[in-house]
Amino acid sequence: MKQYLHLMKKVLNEGTEKEDRTGTGTVSIFGHQMRFNLKEGFPLVTTKKCHLRSIIHELLWFLKGDTNIAYLRENQVSIWEEWADKTGSLGPIYGKQWRAWGTPDGHQVDQLSQTLELLKNNPDSRRMIVSAWNVGELDKMALAPCHAFFQFYVVKKTLSCQLYQRSCDVFLGLPFNIASYSLLMHMIAQQCDFFLGDFVWTGGDIHLYSNHLDQAHLQLTREPRSLPHLLINRKPDSLFDYHFEDFSLEKYNPYPAIKAPVAI
């Protein structure tokens, strides 16, 4: 994960101080790309301990098309608590857009299912895209999508994916995002009988919050360790039938966690 630490150092060294929606303040750069070869290991940050259970449950929750945090609460995942209303609803965020994008005539589009069909039946397509950035529903969302748009690419039975992330919290959010989309790639590769290729991450406004700077400097003192390996213990009938127990991680040997406040 040296790419991640390089980006963190770049933000610290080259970033500009900016105000932001949360009122916290950031140091920010605009535009950067990283590439992770998933054949070399699962890209979960080792320079601090990451909560893989939350990453897995959040992705399974997205895949269900769910936008209420009840499922997350049942599984002791609290990462969306601050944005939910009294009923637990977050509005039409990621899961709704991935699985049930509303059309002007009142129908719904399951973008993920359509993309899976293309991956299986027309893998040379340039339309294997899923978007969460639904302009017509942004004002109904508790939080506008940060990881907004992703595209798949297949060559010689090898699956790659590129994500565009319009807003990136480097210290807290980015390790989750990299691991989450890499996990999704593992699942789709299994479902489609593909080899694993590259996860390509492209960022827009890439920032460290002003109350994360000390934590970032601490993390940069730590030498990255070998990447762990993700195992999927069974092959479900579809992408939407995975359970938490289907995943295990081997040889994850991180440094201790580094606590930091979440900007709301």
From Swiss-Prot:
Top-rank taxon: Bacteria
Keywords associated with the record: Cytoplasm, Methyltransferase, Nucleotide biosynthesis, Transferase
Organism: Hamiltonella defensa subsp. Acyrthosiphon pisum (strain 5AT)
Any single GO CC term annotated in Swiss-Prot or TrEMBL for this entry: cytosol
Coiled coil found in the keyword field: no
Binding partners and assembly: Homodimer.
Cystine connections: none
Functional pathway: Pyrimidine metabolism; dTTP biosynthesis
Protein's recorded name: Thymidylate synthase
GO molecular function: thymidylate synthase activity
Residues where (6R)-5,10-methylene-5,6,7,8-tetrahydrofolate binds: H51, D169, A263
EC number(s) stated in the UniProt entry for this protein: 2.1.1.45
